[in-house]
C-alpha cells in the first residue's frame, strides 16, 4: 500500500511541472486549460464516493489492483491527447481511479490495524508526499526538456497561435511532439502498473475478507454542535487542500513567468515545497506521540501565515521564494491528519462524516486552482497564487479557534444519555 501511495503522489503532482508542456501539447495557454483541475477533482470526488460503496461488496485487493491499472492507463493516455476536451475527459477518468485508490487504501489501513493504525496511516500519507516530492525531479531533471526561454502569458498566447496555424490541428490523439513529456508520464504509469500486479497477487492469496474493527458504542462521543462542527471542518479542509494544491501546481509556472527562474530552478523549487511537505509529514509521526493534534494545527497555521506573508511581501525575490516555500511546505504537512485526529477527540467520526471531509477537500482541489488559473490569465502581473494562499491561511487561522470553541462546549446530560441510540451523521 505504501508503494501504491508513492505512485499516487507522483501521478497527482506530475501535473504541476508538466502543466505548461500539456498546454503546448493541446495548443492552449495555461489560463484556458485550468479546467483540467476541475475535471480531475470531479473524477476524484466521484471515485471517492463510488469506491466507498464498492469496498463493502468487492474484495479490496482486487478493486485496488483494478483501480491502479486504470490509473496507469490514464497516465499512458494523457500525453497523447491533442485537444483540450479530450485531455479534460481523460483527466476526469484518471481522477476517478485515483479517488477509488485513495479511499480504498485508507479503508484497508483501518481494516488491518483499526484504532491502533495511526502510525501506519501517517506512513501511508508520508508515502504520498514522498511521491509528490519525486514527481518534479522526474519530470524536469530526469526526463527534462532543454531549458526554454522564459515567457509571459502573452508570449505563450502568441506561441500557441503560431503552433496551431503551422501544425496539423485535425488529430485529437497522437504522439506528442515532446517525447520527454511522454516518458515522464509513462515511467510513473509503469511503476503503478507493477504495483497493481502485487495487489492482484494479494487478491489471489487472500480470499477471506478482513473484519472491520469498529469503535464500540460505549466509547462513542458526540459534540454539542456536532453538525456545525462538521460543516466548519468541511470549510477548513476546503481552503487548506485548495491552497496546498494551488501552490504545488502553480509554483512552477509562477516562478518561471513572474520571478524569471529557469525551468530547472523552478522544478527544484517545486520539489522543495513537496520535499519539506514530505519530510515534515514523516516527522509528524513522531511529534504526534507527545504533541496534541490541536497544538500541531496551531503551529501549522502560524507557519503558513508567516510564510505566505513574506511570499506576498517579497514576491519578486528568488531567495525569499526559496525560504518561504520551504517553510510553507513544512507548515502544511501535518494539518490534514492532525485535523482528523483533533475532531475525533471531541466527536466520533462515522463513515458519512469522513466522506463529508473528503468532499470538502475534493471541492477545494477542484474549485480553487481552476479559479486561480482564470484570474491569473486576467491579471498576469499580479501574484494571484500568493494572494490566494495568504487568504486561505488567514481564513483557516481564524476558523480553528471557532471550531475549538464549539467542540469544547459542554454536552447536556440528557444528550449524553441519548447518544448510544443515535445513529445520525
From Swiss-Prot:
It is a multi-pass membrane protein. The keyword Transmembrane applies. It is found in: Apical cell membrane. InterPro entries: MFS, MFS_trans_sf. Pfam families: MFS_1. May function as a sodium-dependent glucose transporter. Potential channels for urea in the inner medulla of kidney. The gene is Mfsd4b1. Keywords: Cell membrane, Ion transport, Membrane, Sodium, Sodium transport, Sugar transport, Symport, Transmembrane, Transmembrane helix, Transport. One of its GO terms (cellular component) is apical plasma membrane. The chain crosses the membrane at residues 35-55, 61-81, 84-104, 123-143, 183-203, 228-248, 271-291, 294-314, 320-340, 355-375, 382-402. This is Sodium-dependent glucose transporter 1A. One of its GO terms (biological process) is sodium ion transport. Belongs to the major facilitator superfamily. GO terms for molecular function: symporter activity.
Amino acid at each position: 500500500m505504501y508503494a501504491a501511495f508513492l505512485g499516487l503522489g507522483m501521478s497527482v503532482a506530475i501535473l504541476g511541472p508538466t502543466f505548461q508542456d500539456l498546454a503546448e501539447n493541446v495548443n492552449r495557454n495555461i489560463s484556458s486549460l485550468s479546467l483540467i483541475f476541475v475535471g480531475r477533482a470531479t473524477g476524484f470526488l466521484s471515485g471517492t464516493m463510488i469506491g466507498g460503496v464498492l469496498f463493502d461488496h468487492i474484495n479490496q485487493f482486487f478493486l485496488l489492483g483494478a483501480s491502479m491499472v486504470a490509473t496507469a492507463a490514464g497516465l499512458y493516455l494523457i500525453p497523447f491527447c491533442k485537444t483540450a476536451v479530450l485531455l479534460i475527459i481523460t483527466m476526469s477518468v484518471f481522477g476517478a481511479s485515483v479517488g477509488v485508490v485513495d479511499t480504498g487504501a485508507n479503508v484497508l489501513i483501518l481494516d488491518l490495524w483499526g484504532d491502533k493504525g495511526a502510525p501506519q496511516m501517517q506512513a501511508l500519507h508520508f508515502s504520498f508526499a514522498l511521491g509528490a516530492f519525486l514527481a518534479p525531479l522526474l519530470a524536469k531533471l530526469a526526463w527534462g526538456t532543454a531549458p526554454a526561454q522564459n515567457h509571459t502569458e502573452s508570449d505563450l498566447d502568441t506561441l500557441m497561435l503560431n503552433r496551431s496555424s503551422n501544425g496539423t490541428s485535425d488529430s485529437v490523439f497522437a504522439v506528442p511532439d515532446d517525447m520527454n513529456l511522454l516518458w515522464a508520464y509513462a515511467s510513473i504509469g509503469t511503476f503503478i502498473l507493477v504495483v497493481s500486479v502485487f495487489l492482484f497477487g494479494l487478491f489471489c492469496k487472500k480470499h477471506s475478507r478482513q473484519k472491520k474493527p469498529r469503535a464500540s458504542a460505549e466509547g462513542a462521543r458526540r459534540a454539542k454542535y456536532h453538525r456545525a462542527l462538521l460543516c466548519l471542518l468541511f470549510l477548513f479542509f476546503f481552503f487548506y487542500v485548495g491552497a496546498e494544491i494551488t501552490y504545488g501546481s502553480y509554483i512552477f509556472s509562477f516562478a518561471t513567468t513572474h520571478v524569471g527562474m529557469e525551468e530547472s530552478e523552478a522544478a527544484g523549487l517545486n520539489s522543495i515545497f513537496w520535499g519539506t511537505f514530505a519530510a515534515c509529514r514523516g516527522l509528524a509521526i513522531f511529534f504526534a506521540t507527545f504533541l496534541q493534534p490541536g497544538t500541531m494545527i496551531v503551529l501549522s497555521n502560524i507557519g503558513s501565515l508567516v510564510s505566505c506573508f513574506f511570499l506576498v511581501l517579497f514576491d519578486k525575490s528568488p531567495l525569499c521564494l526559496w525560504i518561504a516555500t520551504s517553510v510553507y511546505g513544512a507548515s502544511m504537512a501535518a494539518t490534514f491528519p492532525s485535523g482528523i485526529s483533533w475532531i475525533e477527540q471531541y466527536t466520533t467520526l462515522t463513515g458519512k462524516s469522513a466522506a463529508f471531509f473528503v468532499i470538502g477537500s475534493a471541492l477545494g482541489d477542484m474549485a480553487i486552482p481552476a479559479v486561480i488559473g482564470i484570474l491569473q490569465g486576467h491579471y498576469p502581473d499580479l501574484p494571484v497564487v500568493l494572494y490566494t494562499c495568504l487568504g486561505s491561511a488567514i481564513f483557516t487561522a481564524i476558523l480553528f479557534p471557532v471550531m475549538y470553541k464549539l467542540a469544547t462546549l459542554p454536552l447536556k446530560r440528557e444528550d449524553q444519555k441519548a447518544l448510544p441510540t443515535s445513529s445520525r451523521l
